[in-house]
């Protein structure tokens, strides 16, 4: 039975980049990874109303640089930058190193997979019909430039006794094409009947080497000389050009002694 690979992990180093960008040896790797997970969970709770799409963490030279992608950057920054300063000081206490916080605005939140999934889960928690929430999100995404979208919900939908899975798709979502820019995200709705999981795939068109792809330096190929070739060697052309006079195809032969012809 075929299963779906994670679209982001499948495209790492091709058209996607890592969300945590740092290097650690074997002794520190687990602790730093656990620290990143804790920072993301803290930011998710702290900025619940700021529509945060994703968080990128970098660690250059005993520092930390955190980039927060949000569709409402004003909520993150706060009045006169007060909220972001409090956030920065809290993150420095957690990580133990100087932290720089950058805010990036998401221009089209209707086509961001994480924001779509979070929006659907919030509607499910407010007891809105799951079909209505899913179809409305699909219509908004297609209207604002997405080439395809697929949404799947699983759990006790509408409070039924037996859990089931339902999904809807509009446009095309080529999961096996590496150059396809697939934005994938998941979210969970905590309802009175239990947890309902939501998965979202958004196809934004083909891409290779742009957007969030890692930069790879291209090495110029050197033309190697032909094996056992000497300078000045040249193969004769097939049409006979460059051959000595009389050797070209179709050239008239000259008469001479012993050719059986006598001049008249």
Curated annotation (Swiss-Prot):
Superkingdom of the organism of origin: Bacteria
HAMAP family named in the record: Ribosomal_uS3_B
Cysteine-cysteine disulfides: none
Protein name: Small ribosomal subunit protein uS3
Region (Disordered): 217-264
Function: Binds the lower part of the 30S subunit head. Binds mRNA in the 70S ribosome, positioning it for translation.
Pfam hit, one: KH_2
Residues passing through the membrane, by range: none
């Amino acid at each position: 039975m075929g299963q779906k690979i994670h679209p982001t992990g499948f495209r790492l180093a091709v058209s996607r980049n890592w969300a945590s960008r740092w290097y650690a040896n074997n002794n520190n790797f687990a602790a730093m990874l656990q620290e990143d997970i804790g920072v993301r969970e803290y930011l998710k709770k702290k900025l619940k109303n700021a529509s945060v799409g994703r968080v990128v963490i970098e660690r250059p030279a005993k520092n930390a640089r955190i980039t927060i992608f949000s569709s409402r950057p004003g909520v993150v920054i706060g009045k006169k930058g007060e909220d972001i300063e409090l956030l920065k000081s809290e993150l420095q206490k957690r990580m133990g190193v100087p932290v720089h916080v950058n805010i990036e605005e998401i221009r089209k939140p209707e086509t961001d997979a994480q924001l779509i999934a979070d929006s659907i889960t919030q509607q499910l928690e407010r007891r809105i019909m799951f079909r209505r929430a899913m179809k409305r999100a699909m219509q908004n995404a297609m209207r604002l430039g997405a080439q395809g979208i697929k949404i799947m919900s699983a759990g006790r939908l509408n409070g039924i006794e037996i859990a089931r899975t339902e999904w809807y798709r509009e446009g095309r979502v080529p999961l096996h094409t590496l150059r396809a820019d697939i934005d994938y995200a998941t979210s969970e709705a905590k309802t009175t009947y239990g947890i309902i999981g939501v998965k979202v795939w958004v196809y934004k068109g083909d891409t290779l080497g742009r957007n969030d792809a890692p930069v790879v330096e291209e090495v110029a190929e050197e033309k190697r000389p032909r094996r056992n070739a000497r300078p000045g060697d040249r193969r004769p052309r097939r049409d006979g050009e460059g051959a000595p006079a009389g050797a070209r195809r179709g050239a008239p032969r000259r008469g001479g002694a012993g050719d059986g012809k006598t001049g008249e």
